[in-house]
Amino acid sequence: MRLTAKQVTWLKVCLHLAGLLPFLWLVWAINHGGLGADPVKDIQHFTGLTALKFLLAALLITPLARYAKQPLLIRTRRLLGLWCFAWATLHLTSYALLELGVNNLALLGKELITRPYLTLGIISWVILLALAFTSTQSMQRKLGKHWQQLHNFVYLVAILAPIHYLWSVKIISPQPLIYAGLAVLLLALRYKKLLSLFNRLRKQAHNKLSL
């Protein structure tokens, strides 16, 4: 049985709740002592992990829609991507304001050098910003064939974000490994497309070097 447009609309409502409820919980935890001994680290971890969850969920939609034969499910992908960007922005903001502090934002450059995993996080966020900004149908029409080329960069985020997570933890635990494994699995489901993209980029690079 295929999903109807009405059912997809209700699914979107549920996804909005899934994006909003963690924020409400975080606000409650901050105000009621629900965080651990290092609340700043807990906030950063929670916001980053939630962003990663939405990224993986967005990547899951295409293979799920294909294998379950639910084409309308694709309509939820943009919503999941926007929630991923929202939580990634909260993650970056919590680091900039709570760890560095408003008066020490100039130290960000030094931090990027001493903590390379931060560079991966910043690159991922910039890509997500570009994808969120161009996610509308009007931007899709305006960019034409370049729209898909731009949005293929989500696969780079799917590589960089788990590495950022693994690199940022002092002790490797099962959790970051599980999320990294899920990212690898979701990318593996697209191996033909990724191989085609890689060959195309290699050909373009070769042509430019030959000029």
From Swiss-Prot:
Keywords: Cell inner membrane, Cell membrane, Electron transport, Flavoprotein, FMN, Heme, Iron, Membrane, Metal-binding, Transmembrane, Transmembrane helix, Transport. It holds the Pfam family Ferric_reduct. The chain crosses the membrane at residues 45-65, 82-102, 116-136, 153-173, 178-198. GO terms for molecular function: electron transfer activity; FMN binding; heme binding; metal ion binding; oxidoreductase activity, acting on diphenols and related substances as donors. Binds 1 FMN per subunit. Binds 1 heme b (iron(II)-protoporphyrin IX) group per subunit. GO terms for biological process: protein repair. Its cofactor is FMN; heme b. Belongs to the MsrQ family. Heterodimer of a catalytic subunit (MsrP) and a heme-binding subunit (MsrQ). Part of the MsrPQ system that repairs oxidized periplasmic proteins containing methionine sulfoxide residues (Met-O), using respiratory chain electrons. Thus protects these proteins from oxidative-stress damage caused by reactive species of oxygen and chlorine generated by the host defense mechanisms. MsrPQ is essential for the maintenance of envelope integrity under bleach stress, rescuing a wide series of structurally unrelated periplasmic proteins from methionine oxidation, including the primary periplasmic chaperone SurA and the lipoprotein Pal. This is Protein-methionine-sulfoxide reductase heme-binding subunit MsrQ. It comes from Escherichia coli O127:H6 (strain E2348/69 / EPEC). The gene is msrQ.
